[in-house]
């Protein structure tokens, strides 16, 4: 199966030679924009973007690998102090597949004077998002901002190992935008045609430019909502998909699926024929196992552990230059390959074990929901394995670096997988895991001192999707960076806290939970009131902001996965102190959400337990926001419950 990417790889070098460097000059500023006093699109807007332009080109990096470059240019007008505060620190997020380069910024004051951002003032940091997940950003502080000022900045995003064949062009930001402009050069490859799918917007026809680029533009774009636990941004913001496909491809749903599944099946069938070495490995892996599920887990582990990955962010440079295997047998012989080679080896092992296994194609729920999938290969970019188990299917991702037995990450659960079998392709919804699978377990053993200081040890275990998610975000960081990120997170919640003996355990031992542990000293954790101390037993919830604090909701609700939490806290009181008897917080049963706290005291020891679970992954209407907010608000109040610790004997 020859893809357009394969055909275009040699052409990317030519494109790089023909592409000129981005102009270093700033774009001309219309006097009307400098004198603009009121927002144009949203009367309540604190700031609006006057222009957001993105130029998309292809290039080749120093290792000969194709890259796609997005040259961004953003100019925004500040109208109020709230807008000034919103732009005080500007963050540009990126991940392991993206490099941020050539970042420049400046402020134009209302009187026309210009204040540049110094390169030395641009830095990289990590910010914490929902669920303790951390994101890397390039940051800078915008200088001399005030109402009436304009902030403009430009940067390049290099997307590694990429050719601009399947583009997702976003047309909205977190503030209204007067004009959005995308400039791209359509690729000319015989036998392929460009296809476009617009979403959530009324887009005018593309306009060809004199320099060979094509302009896609949209004016007066409303701000996109930025709310916690929202669906993927592509589900509600205006965007356009630009892709390419064979000119002979049919675009009716069923005909597309048959043709696409046939290509996928034939590709993997050719590369996953077992040889003697594969048969021997399969026999060893499933020896003594009887159930299909156990065999699948064992074969997935065998495929993952026998091949050293060559394309991951943690792979050494020499591994990335290793020979590319042509099939499963060659991959096993080399002992190395890509994630796709791991999948191919698994399919060969399954065949050797007389299991009925097929490749399956899907898309991440972190990107797009099934309702927005269109009949194009780019909407089925991910490859999994489907193994028949009676009248059901077991779906695994053998190449999952963060699961010992090939369990699928959360973002494939509830997605529709297209199983490419011999005849008619099968559409199958990947089942969700229960809340008990993804457990966050926190254990704390603390001593309360007479002055209100709390000190002791904490251990947090992350299982299931928690463990996979945090391993994935942390594996590219050094041990020192992991420690710093944990220290920063906890000191933000507990100001003045002193952490020591920080340990990050089981990064590579996937058979065990991912663990963070540390010793901590928190001055002033309990507040003194005369001879009494006011103490919050829910130590791990202190300083945590309420989830769903906003009174209103714009976007639908989207929960990545069902999860549970279990806290066990032991606090030893100062000598001569005891806890006054009082009613503790009550359990909460909200159907899919359960919360069970308990507080008890025995002599000088307080025991606190907290169990919480939420069993509602997927997308839910905004009408459910009220009950959900009530649940989280009640839980937050219960977490903040305090007890009175009184001196019972003289010091």
Give residue ranges: language-model regions.
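Bacterial N-terminal signal peptides
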Residues: 8-18
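Positively charged n-region of N-terminal signal peptides that target proteins for export
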Residues: 1-6
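A sensor for short, sequence-defined functional sites
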Residues: 22-651
